[in-house]
Structures are given as structure tokens and as C-alpha cells.
């Protein structure tokens, strides 16, 4: 067989593989509706209930990613800084609540000692 024939066969085979493969996969992949219909009724109900919440969480995540990408720093460093900031706020809140509880205990102790 000539070289031109070999090249043509390879081009046709490559085209069939490159175009036909993804087309075949797309044709056998179930749609979201078909997958949803395969769920049992409990999963369908739970999926419908949690859909809005998950959509909101995803929107919040995308918003945070946009904020992080505006920074000159890497997204990973910006995310890490935000986590550290949240952790510091949580620690401060916990220490405030511990201080309030300690002050309340001291006041209660003073009241008890003062009444005796």
C-alpha cells in the first residue's frame, strides 16, 4: 500500500477515535433527570430539600474565590489567611465567654458568701 493510503487510513482512524469516542460517551451518559429518577423516594426528597442550601453554599464559595483572586497573593494563601482570621475570632469569642462565665461565678460566689 502506498504511503498516501496509509496516511489516509490513519487520519480516518484518528478522526473516528477523536470524534466518535466522546460522542459515544456522551450518548451513553445519563442526564441529571435520569439519575434523579433512579433515586429512591427518600433520596429524591432529601435532594430536593438540600438543593437550595447547596446552591447557596456554592454561590458563597464562588464569591469567596472571587474575593481571594482579587488579592495579589495566591488564592491558597488568601484562603489560609481567612481561615486564620476566623480561628482568631473564634478564639477571642471563646475567651470572652470564658471570662464572662468566670465573672458570673465570682459574682455568685460573692453573693453566697455575703448572704452567710
Curated annotation (Swiss-Prot):
Residues 86-116 are annotated as: Disordered. The chain crosses the membrane at residues 7-25. It comes from the Eukaryota. GO terms for cellular component: mitochondrial inner membrane. It is found in: Mitochondrion inner membrane. Keywords: Chaperone, Coiled coil, Membrane, Mitochondrion, Mitochondrion inner membrane, Transmembrane, Transmembrane helix. One of its GO terms (biological process) is mitochondrial respiratory chain complex III assembly. It is a single-pass membrane protein. Residues 77-116 form a coiled coil. InterPro entries: Cbp4. Its main location: mitochondrion. Belongs to the CBP4 family. Essential for the assembly of ubiquinol-cytochrome c reductase. It has a direct effect on the correct occurrence of the Rieske protein, core 4, core 5 and apocytochrome b. This is Assembly factor cbp4. It comes from Aspergillus clavatus (strain ATCC 1007 / CBS 513.65 / DSM 816 / NCTC 3887 / NRRL 1 / QM 1276 / 107).
